[in-house]
Curated annotation (Swiss-Prot):
One of its GO terms (cellular component) is cytosol. It holds the Pfam family Ala_racemase_N. PROSITE patterns: ALANINE_RACEMASE. The active site is at K33, Y253. Keywords: Isomerase, Pyridoxal phosphate. Transmembrane segments: none annotated. Its cofactor is pyridoxal 5'-phosphate. It comes from Xanthomonas oryzae pv. oryzae (strain MAFF 311018). GO terms for biological process: D-alanine biosynthetic process. PANTHER family: ALANINE RACEMASE, ALANINE RACEMASE, CATABOLIC-RELATED. It catalyses: L-alanine = D-alanine. This is Alanine racemase.
């Protein structure tokens, strides 16, 4: 079988959730949308459920996958519902929903629910994506709070630039949210991963950690808090061929790398169809049997090439680590002009293996 594999450390996942709880000083919904950022929503939710306050997903399809797998904890639909018929499923499966548009508010007000629903009312405080204007937000709260089909309301907003620690936008959003929500008796939710890791003055009742759960740093530099994150995914493959190139010979499409010395080249079973960044530059580091080696040549659909010249002991079958504890996915993403979110979510055909911890053997493969 092809040797590319992503190893998922479930104990690291639990560690990062506990860190989010500690930094937030509040309840926390573990965000497992997009298949838990490429880590597998069901096994990640199963690992976290004994201690998680709940989960958050993008849409009802993702929530139903968790319910069908036996997850009983609260699940919030971050985009709410797209069709009125989904409200019946929300009630049937005891889901929580965001209300972020006037249409969703009207639908909730008209819905004769068989059980009261828990609704998260979302205000647009400056993201200008989903969310009610401050005026509509207050009007929606007044409209929904007394209805029998509404069990409770949580007031939420989303930070647009919290990953920029020197940007005033986060403070501006927090002030706008506080001014509008002032006097409304309800729990609040404001902090996402960068809000938890980089903005300690922010306070809320519910945090929504996403990227940080998986051990990735949302900032371009390390901080005291991000240094405590543990990478959850380790992406590995193996060398499938070794060849020697003389001076002047190129490697790969477009001859982006030309040997300036006699070069020992390792071909690795990993390409952009697996989710490795296609435009990773020459010199991007990987680990070959624990030794740093530079990527050379253009990344192909199914393969990439590395320079083994300085590590003559490396041969066919050597383990190649593309990201994990080293190299970290965040710096790799920056080097390749993509985001860590994109890399983690992009592993479409790489099989995942789940381990209880980095020091414990494999427990399951999916």
């Amino acid at each position: 079988m092809r040797p590319a594999q992503a190893s998922i450390d479930l104990e690291a996942l639990r560690h990062n959730y506990r860190l989010a709880k500690r930094l937030g000083g509040s309840k926390a919904l573990a965000v497992v949308k997009a298949d838990a950022y490429g880590h597998g929503a069901v096994p990640c939710a199963q690992a976290l459920e004994p201690e998680a306050d709940g989960f958050a997903v993008a849409c009802i399809e993702e929530a139903l996958e968790l319910r069908q797998a036996g997850i009983r904890a609260p699940i919030l639909l971050l985009e709410g519902f797209f069709e009125h018929d989904e409200l019946r499923l929300i009630a049937e499966h005891d889901l929580w929903t965001v209300a972020a548009t006037p249409q969703q508010v009207r639908a909730l007000a008209a819905f004769q629910s068989p059980r009261p629903l828990r609704v998260w009312l979302k205000m647009d405080s400056g993201m200008h994506r989903l969310g009610l204007s401050p005026e509509d937000f207050r009007a929606a709260w007044l409209r929904l709070r007394g209805l029998p089909q509404i069990a409770s309301l949580v007031l939420m907003t989303h930070l647009a630039r919290a990953d920029e620690l020197d940007c005033s936008r986060t403070d501006e959003q927090a002030v706008a949210f506080a001014l509008t929500a002032g006097g409304m008796r309800a729990e609040t939710s404001l902090r996402n991963s960068p809000g938890l890791l980089g903005w300690p003055a922010l306070r809320n009742d519910w945090s929504r950690p996403g990227l940080m759960l998986y051990g990735a740093n949302p900032f371009p530099q390390d901080t005291e808090n991000t240094a405590q994150l543990r990478p959850v995914m380790t992406l590995r493959s193996r060398i499938i061929l070794v060849r020697d190139l003389p001076v002047g010979e190129p490697v790969g499409y477009g001859a982006r790398f030309v040997a300036e010395r006699p070069t020992r080249v390792g071909v690795v079973a990993m390409g952009y169809a697996d989710g490795y960044p296609q435009f990773a530059p020459n010199g991007t580091p990987v680990l070959v049997d624990g030794q740093v080696c530079p990527l050379i040549g253009r990344v192909s659909m199914d393969m990439l090439t590395v320079d083994l010249t300085d590590h003559p002991q490396a041969d066919i079958g050597a383990t190649v680590q593309l990201w994990g504890q080293a190299p970290r996915v965040g710096p790799l993403a920056t080097q390749c002009n993509v985001s860590a979110y994109q890399l983690l979510c992009g592993l479409k055909r790489v099989p995942r293996t789940y381990v209880a911890s980095a020091a414990v053997g494999e427990v399951a493969a999916r």
